[in-house]
């Protein structure tokens, strides 16, 4: 099977993700509530119910690229028990999965394969970039390593670390669940562009900046 990587056109309308069109819009349900209160509230309840089921039944696609995958698999053991978050059903086929975790170093030769696997996943689908190598290439600032998977995939959650601990992966799942709960997707089957609404997620660094800057007494390494 031949794999091809979709090239980015710097002069194009959507130069970052050629396969998707992204724009900043208001929450469509807020507009619906002002038009018809009853139908707006009903649609809001239906979205909440569907999103509740989606965020508590995430099916990850089982594949890994490097050492970060070992930490990801560790979270599936009884010690961490990722089943508490409804994400223990690993799928061997991208057509049965809705979460892709890019765990490890993404080489240039592997990028078209990852992109093809992402295209085979059905909506709704999400992407987690796990580890420094997947986020920005890590220490491999060379021609053969992609400097961040967000160069060719839309990433929902980034996990820092080299490699991140299983607890970091579980926190990323919780952040993804929070984001899924705020999504607005068509409640019926749609062919073509689904017009998905996703709320902006504030980075943890910005969200916890005030709390961290207020700390005056730092813990010793033995207390961490």
Curated annotation (Swiss-Prot):
An annotated Gene Ontology molecular function: 4 iron, 4 sulfur cluster binding
Main location: membrane
Known EC number: 7.1.1.-
One GO BP annotation of this record: electron transport coupled proton transport
GO cellular-component term (any): plasma membrane
Keyword Isomerase: no
Signal peptide: none
Catalyzed reaction equations: a quinone + NADH + 5 H(+)(in) = a quinol + NAD(+) + 4 H(+)(out)
Keyword set, alphabetical order: 4Fe-4S, Cell inner membrane, Cell membrane, Iron, Iron-sulfur, Membrane, Metal-binding, NAD, Quinone, Translocase, Transport, Ubiquinone
Cited InterPro entries: NADH_UbQ_OxRdtase-like_20kDa (IPR006137), NADH_UQ_OxRdtase_20Kd_su (IPR006138)
Requisite cofactors: [4Fe-4S] cluster
Annotated compartments: Cell inner membrane
NCBIfam families according to UniProt: nuoB_fam (TIGR01957), PRK06411.1 (NF005012)
Listed name of the protein: NADH-quinone oxidoreductase subunit B
Species assigned in the record: Serratia proteamaculans (strain 568)
């Amino acid at each position: 099977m031949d794999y091809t990587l979709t090239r980015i056109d710097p002069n194009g309308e959507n130069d970052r993700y050629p396969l998707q069109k992204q724009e900043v819009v208001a929450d469509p349900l807020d507009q619906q509530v002002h038009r018809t209160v009853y139908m707006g509230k009903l649609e809001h309840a239906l979205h909440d119910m569907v999103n509740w089921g989606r965020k508590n039944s995430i099916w990850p696609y089982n594949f890994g690229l490097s050492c970060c995958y070992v930490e990801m698999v560790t979270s599936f053991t009884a010690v961490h028990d990722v089943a508490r978050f409804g994400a223990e059903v690993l799928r061997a086929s991208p057509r049965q999965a809705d979460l892709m975790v890019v765990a490890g170093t993404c080489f240039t030769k592997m990028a078209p394969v990852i992109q093809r696997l992402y295209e085979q996943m059905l909506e709704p689908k999400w992407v987690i970039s796990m580890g420094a190598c997947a986020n920005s290439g890590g220490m491999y600032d060379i021609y053969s390593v992609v400097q961040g998977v967000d160069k060719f995939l839309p990433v929902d959650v980034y996990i820092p670390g080299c490699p991140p601990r299983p607890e970091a992966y579980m926190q990323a799942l919780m952040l993804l669940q929070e984001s899924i709960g705020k999504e607005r997707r068509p409640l019926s089957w749609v062919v073509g562009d689904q017009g998905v609404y996703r709320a902006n997620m504030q980075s943890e660094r910005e969200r916890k900046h005030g709390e961290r800057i207020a700390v005056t007494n730092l813990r010793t390494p033995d207390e961490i």
